[in-house]
Design a protein with these regions (language model features):
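ATP-dependent carboxylate/phosphate-activation module, predominantly the ATP-grasp catalytic core
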Residues: 192-256, 268, 279-306, 323-327
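Conserved N-proximal alpha/beta basic substrate-recognition cap immediately N-terminal to
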Residues: 37, 47-145
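A short glycine-rich, hydrophobically flanked beta-strand micro-motif that places a catalytic Asp/Glu
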Residues: 258-270
């Protein structure tokens, strides 16, 4: 199989604008982790793309943007020469959905979630509505035309289609959240702050079943009203009573079209897990799966392309937690 891997930020998606350092660093981490796994698979010939402002990737075939070529055109060129494409991109602005649709439009194999599933999970409000309709516990999510309940405590205001902690703001109460929504009514949502450990799930989905690969602890810093993800402890939390595997199954049933690697952000409250958002793509936790579990997650994903394959559901391996730092050498 000829496979084209496209990491949007480090792979040319910002070729016509300045590279955002934090996003480029995180994207490069995910890309290198995935390429290392793919490099072990017989019969898989991988090509990627590279922003020429970044160091080259030794031993990896990479294409670079041509004069005037934007990220979408670069992706189309790479996918056209391959049998399958694996896009990794922020959901923001519909970027990931557009890449997925282009892949299928070209008649190529998409190693990722369906465009419709990406479109749904891109919107935090739509995701919350879909999960709530299926009885999955999730954080209440409000837009500018909703009446915010006067719940005590701080609230979070964020872009409805945001990725990670980008532009996430913590405000002191529901009134401040309401005012923030009014200031930018088209793009923002507000959610009450949920107390409890910030965790995430790494899932393997096939559109029908789901396998819980790991439960990860997120090390989050809140300062000056800004929320920052500083590090992740991959496979640092055990699913002792099976409630997290059960949550994964309920999410997969509620959101058809999730396929391949999927991330879930949630808070573990005293009443149980509460979902914050679904990431229909590789997340940074992927970078620690090999060290923590001794598995090749890329092999598991591509194995789902084989005829009559189905995801198995063994419990997460015990393993040893792996620590993935998102801080730069400058400590940001």
């Amino acid at each position: 199989m000829n496979l084209f891997v496209f990491e949007f930020v480090s792979g040319g998606g910002f070729c016509d604008k300045p590279l955002p350092p934090a996003l480029a660093r995180e994207g490069d981490m995910m890309l290198r982790g995935l390429l290392a796994d793919l490099g072990e698979l017989p019969g898989v010939c991988t090509t990627t793309s590279r922003d020429p402002r970044l160091p080259p990737l030794p031993g990896v075939r990479a294409i670079v943007p041509g004069p005037g070529e934007d990220g979408a055109a670069l992706y189309a060129r790479g996918a056209a020469a391959a049998d399958a494409a694996w896009p990794i991109a922020p959901e923001t602005g519909g970027v990931l959905e557009a890449l997925a649709r282009e892949t299928l439009h070209m008649g190529k194999i998409l190693a990722g979630c369906s465009p419709d599933a990406i479109r749904l999970t891109t919107s935090k409000r739509s995701t919350a509505c879909a999960l709530r309709a299926s009885g999955v516990p999730c954080v209440p999510t409000f837009a500018h035309d909703d009446v915010l309940p006067p719940l005590p405590g701080p609230w979070v205001v964020k872009p409805d289609d945001g990725a990670g902690c980008d532009h996430v703001i913590l405000v002191p109460d529901w009134r401040a959240a309401r005012d923030r929504l009014a200031a930018d009514p088209r793009e923002l949502v507000a959610q009450p702050w949920i107390d409890g450990p910030a965790l995430s799930l790494s899932l393997l989905c096939d559109g029908r079943g789901v396998r819980l690969l790991s439960c990860n602890r997120q090390h989050v810093r809140v300062a000056g009203g800004r929320v920052t993800l500083e590090a992740i402890g991959v496979n640092a939390v055990a699913d002792r009573n099976g409630q997290l595997a059960q949550l994964a199954g309920r999410i997969a049933a509620a959101l058809p079209g999730l396929w391949g690697y999927v991330g879930v952000d949630f808070v573990l409250t005293s009443q149980g897990p509460v979902v914050l958002e679904i990431n229909p793509r590789l997340t940074t936790s992927y970078c620690g799966l090999r060290q923590a579990l001794g598995i090749n997650a890329a092999a598991l994903v591509l194995g789902l392309l084989e005829a009559d394959s189905a995801v198995s559901s063994p419990p997460p391996a015990a393993g040893t937690p792996a620590f993935v730092s998102l801080a730069s050498d400058r400590g940001d």
